[in-house]
Each structure stands twice: as structure tokens, then as C-alpha cells.
Amino acid sequence: FTVGAGTYSYLITDDKGCSTSTAITITEPSEMQVTSAATAITCNGGLSTVSVSATGGTAPYSGTGNFSVTAGSYTYPVTDGNGCSSSTTITITEPSVVEASSSATAILCYGGTATVSVSGNGGTAPYNGTGDFSVSAGTYSYIVSDANGCSTSTSITVTEPSEVIVSSSATPILCNGGSSTVSVSATGGT
């Protein structure tokens, strides 16, 4: 007889009508339960540790343990000592990429200053390294990091007009009470 778990009684009768009975109890292992848990990914492109464990069934188990993975959906099959199998599926998420941007006001006069505005987005707010910065002409790099310490950078070049150079010349006055012609010119600036 093919039977599942349970208690069964069997009555046996021979050709002469003599009979006897027997009872048997068949047990089975408890159902195997497979579970998974994962650590959080703090920065885009980072790794999570997935822990897969099993209870029930018959030890030892094959397929349990810790697994290092990137974001995505994963299915982990586990087999017990009797060859019975079950699986668990887990989805790992990650923050978006931290991005930084910068812009600058114009320097109107040679030797002046500009205001560079640095902002962040993506990742996990709030951000460090953002704000407004007063700078002279040059190239600047700013590092922006989010609440999880994930960082990126932005660079900006601030230009300025050339220096205004003024030159002048005058013709000589030849006679007392005479006049001179003065010429004034400027180069540079805007």
C-alpha cells in the first residue's frame, strides 16, 4: 500500500476465515521552511549580504548560508538531508546615484568674485558639501556626500574679464597759454 503519514490498521483474513489485524503509525518530517533576510545597500552599486536559513525538514541543509549580492531579485533553492527542496525569493533595492551640480554667477570686473552654487540630488538626503561659495576666477571641484556617506564631485571653471589697462599721451604745449591734445585709450575689460 502507498500511504501518507498517519495511523493505519490492516485486517488480514486467510482462506479458512481466520483473521488478524495490525496497526502501524507512519510519521513524516515537518515541512521545511526557507527564509531569507538582507542587509541594506547604502550606496548605489554597493553590496548586500543575504542570509538564507532553513527550519523543519531533515538536516543537514544544502543551499543555506550568506551570499554577497548587488541589487536585484534572487531565488535561493534549499535541499534537506532527504532530498526535499524548497526556496525563498528576495528583492534587494538600492538608492539612486548621488549627483552633484554647480553653477556660478558672472565676475563683472577683473579681480572680482563670483558665487558658486552647489547642489545635490539622488542618494539619500540630506547632503553635505552643498551651498553657496564666494570665489575668484579659477577652476574648483566640490565633493557632495549624502546621509549614507556616498559621494560624488562636480567641477566648475569661473572666468573673469581681462584687466582694464588705460594709457594716455599728450602733445606738448609749445607756447605759454597754448593747449595740448590728450589721448586716452583703454584695452581689456568688456
Name each model feature, range by range.
Residues 1-190:
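Proline- and Ser/Thr-rich low-complexity, intrinsically disordered segments
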